[in-house]
């Protein structure tokens, strides 16, 4: 059974600022991950300094990073933010 994806309004605004082809890829990756929770295929890892009671996770999708919570008891993935990865070329 797939997990439900919750995207708050502030994250929707972040998605609106991303070029369409990247936004589509990010949302497709999120949906694919929610269907099977395949951590390796979608490059999902626990954020290092996140609390053990409510760990945050990150997913890489191209040059973007998606931060989210996985609420297993409710079968929900709650997206916190979607940001562009900072590289040495960004000033």
Model segments located where?
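A short, ordered amphipathic alpha-helix with a cationic face
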Residues: 1-2, 33
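Intrinsic disorder/low-structure terminal segments
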Residues: 21, 32, 56, 67-68
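A short, well-structured alpha-helix characteristic of acyl/acetyltransferase catalytic modules
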Residues: 23-25, 29
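A short, surface-exposed loop/turn module that caps and links secondary-structure elements
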Residues: 32-58
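Enriched for short, Lys/Arg-rich terminal
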Residues: 2-4, 9, 13-17, 24, ...
